[in-house]
Structure formats: structure tokens, C-alpha cells
Amino acid sequence: MRALAVVVVATAFAVVAVRGEQCGSQAGGALCPNCLCCSQYGWCGSTSAYCGSGCQSQCSGSCGGGGPTPPSGGGGSGVASIVSRSLFDQMLLHRNDAACPAKNFYTYDAFVAAANAFPSFATTGDAATRKREVAAFLAQTSHETTGGWATAPDGPYSWGYCFKEENNGNVGSDYCVQSSQWPCAAGKKYYGRGPIQISYNYNYGPAGQAIGSNLLSNPDLVASDATVSFKTAFWFWMTPQSPKPSCHAVMTGQWTPNGNDQAAGRVPGYGVVTNIINGGVECGHGADSRVADRIGFYKRYCDMLGVSYGANLDCYNQRPFNS
């Protein structure tokens, strides 16, 4: 049941999810696979055109660095400077409950390793901005994977990350849409998996390309390798899909609404992130329990991080981006 929200919204960005740039500022701070250099234009390679002037990361041709240091506001230790291992366990209190199908899958080490592969995550802006971004990411993904209910022990918002597969993998559809660029592999299904419940071949393809894993051939990797699983969620979070900005840009104040956004009631704040993820289903028709659930997780995590919520938390009166 957890994958339904992303599955529905996936069709809204089928065309735009195949953005060409692979790395750097053009791809939300993503690093190139296999230690390749990231050129000033956001492409991966190993020649001087990629590793020379303007190179953004891994410019020595090794994963040890050599390029400009990504923006950082927390001593260079990224998300680990905001969420400790013990706090992670408190935030996702029941993720390893015996009743949760994903028990013992989503580890702190996998979370940190995946986040560090997207060096702009949790390192952009002042301390409050960085904390709010982390709270927003964990809130949205907690909603997508929640096992909670209204009267659940410790409250409904302590049951995030209970699921890792849509309907525990018991799905009828293969979620394959004909595509020459992202062809489906024989016998594979592309249903919702991981923290963001990534769905469909046209999302598995570019996500896998960005993180250096062939997810078209092996989509099950998203449900068997926790680091890969988290990376698909960070890819979605960091990657703009026109006309939508990236969730990262919204939560770090880098997104400015244009005229169409303003006319549609889309204003900076956590509510736009919900609109990006599942606006076609949840936004623009007044109060919605799913939006409220996303807000509930967000407020809990902000409280635990000691940061204010910011403005415009819901999308009740925002038109979806693709409407």
C-alpha cells in the first residue's frame, strides 16, 4: 500500500524524468559513477574536457577528491552532523519492529553513505535550513513507507520506514511503459521500492544511471541493498523534473516561483515538496489526510531537530504542477 502515492504521480513526470545532465550542480550535486570526473557542464568522463578547467568533483580521476569542496555548513560532515545514529533510531523508532516487513533493512550507515553521494544534501544554507531539509526528506519518505495508524504505539509518526516494497512485492502489474531509452528487462517488475517508492522503468533507468547501478536489469537491488535504496530516494529528492523544481531546491530556498507557480498558488515551503511528489492526487482540492500525514511526520522531525517548521506546510490550495 505504501507505493501507491508515488506510482500514481510517476506518470506525471514520465517524459521529464530523463534529464540529461549526470552530475554536479546540474544534477543536484550527484557524483559520477566509477570515480569519473564531473565537467563544468554536468557530464561524466575521464579526459581533460571533464577533469580540467571547471571540473566540479572527483577531478583527479579518483574518489579521493581533487575537485572543489561541495558547499558545507556543518564542519564538512554533512548529514551525520545533523542526525546522529541515536537520533536516527529515535526518529524512525519502530522501523525494526517485528511487524515491519523492512525490519533491519534501513540502516543509519546506509542513510549516511547514500546522502554523502549527493554532497549538496544537508550542506546547503544555514543550520536551520539544513535541518529543515533533513526533516522534510525523512518526513516525505516516512509517509511513503509508514506502517503507523492513528492509535499506534508512540503515535502514528514514529512508524516510518516500515515497508520497502509496494504491497510486499505482491503486485500484478510490471509497471513497464514502452521506452527505447529505458527498455524494460524481461521478467522484471518496476513497482515501488525503497524510501521514496520509486516506480516504473522510466524512473528506475535514470536513477540507476545517476548512481552507477543498472536498475533496469536488477530493480530488486532497491529492495536488497539499503545504500542503493536510499540513493534512489536522494536522486529523486535532488533532481529537478521540469516544470517541477527539485525538492532540495525548495527546502533550501533556491526555488523562486514563476508567474505560473504564483497563479497556481504554489509558494515556497514544505507544501510544494508534497506537490512535487504527489500533487496530482493530493493537492488542490482542500484538506487531504495524506497531506496532513506528511505534515505530521515533518513537524515531529523538526521538533526533534530543534528547528521551526517554516511557512506554507500544506498544498491544499495549490494546483498540481502538471495540471
UniProtKB/Swiss-Prot annotation:
EC number of the protein: 3.2.1.14
BP term (GO), one: cell wall macromolecule catabolic process
Protein name per its UniProtKB record: Chitinase 1
PROSITE patterns: CHIT_BIND_I_1 (PS00026), CHIT_BIND_I_2 (PS50941), CHITINASE_19_1 (PS00773), CHITINASE_19_2 (PS00774)
Enzyme class: hydrolase
Matches recorded under CDD domains: chitinase_GH19 (cd00325), ChtBD1_GH19_hevein (cd06921)
Domain Chitin-binding type-1: 21-61
Tissue-by-tissue expression: Expressed in roots, leaves, sheaths and meristems.
Keywords: Carbohydrate metabolism, Chitin degradation, Chitin-binding, Disulfide bond, Glycosidase, Hydrolase, Plant defense, Polysaccharide degradation, Signal
InterPro entries assigned to the protein according to its UniProt record, in alphabetical order: Chitin-bd_1 (IPR001002), Chitin-binding_1_CS (IPR018371), Endochitinase-like_sf (IPR036861), Glyco_hydro_19 (IPR016283), Glyco_hydro_19_cat (IPR000726), Lysozyme-like_dom_sf (IPR023346)
SMART domains: ChtBD1 (SM00270)
PANTHER family (alphabetical): CHITINASE 12 (PTHR22595:SF79), CHITINASE-RELATED (PTHR22595)
Induction: By fungal elicitor and wounding.
Catalytic reactions of this protein: Random endo-hydrolysis of N-acetyl-beta-D-glucosaminide (1->4)-beta-linkages in chitin and chitodextrins
